[in-house]
Amino acid sequence: RLGKAAVIWRFDPLVLSDDITIDDLVEKIRRIGSQIHEYTEKLVFSFADIMSYKRVRLNLERNNIPYHEWEESQMEEVAERISRLNTDEGWGLQLATCSENIDLERHGITHNRCIDGDLIVRLAWRDKALMNFMGVTISKGGPVAGDMFDNDAIALTDGHFFYSVHKKDQGQRKACLCMAAKDIGEYNTCPHMCEYCYANTSKQAALANWKMHNYNPKGETITGK
């Protein structure tokens, strides 16, 4: 079993428009959270930055979606309401934002590492090949997390511990805290057709690739090639 720690709930991005208000977004989060909070430990969200992504802007304009850019006061309101939901509904989730500059620590919301080396070690520290690849040394005995003599040690199970070797991926945005990794995805492959999506340049291409995948679902690539 993967366990709750391996399942990250993402509500990403939060999009505002003439038809989608902050109340609508918070209610959607409440409804989803009430059903899945027992199966995850973390909720990660972000605020749609439309003008920074030409493809996204064109997608929305092409489909006549009257989007709004987020103002800082609106971000603060959403953060406060999500934090209150997390407490009032008894979810007890870790809350974090993805690639956001705004500081929401006052609401108990941190900046996330969506590809998190420390989490990977926590989940797969018994995989020696993976640990060697990441440059992580797993030790046993001695210092533990919270030890007054070694606050940098991160505790695992069975008395094991490690020291973080998380290194930011320099190829990502400044606000992105992900570790260096290789993307194995492929553009124009999702058939859900979300109007916001930055990964589909063409609905026709996405549907064509989806059909190719269905012809050869066990192919070496997602498109079955």
What is each of the regions a protein language model found here?
Residues 203, 207, 214-225:
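Short Fe-S-cluster ligation motifs
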Residues 72-174:
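A C-terminal junction/extension of Radical SAM enzymes
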Residues 46, 98, 200:
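Conserved residues at the C-terminal ends of beta-strands
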Residues 37, 87, 198-202:
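Hydrophobic/aromatic-lined pockets within catalytic cores
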Residues 173-202:
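Local cysteine-cluster metal-coordination motifs and their immediate loop/turn environment
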Residues 1-81:
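Conserved AdoMet/S-adenosylmethionine-binding subsite of the radical SAM
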Residues 50, 102-103, 202-203:
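Short Gly/Pro-enriched loop/turn and capping motifs at secondary-structure junctions
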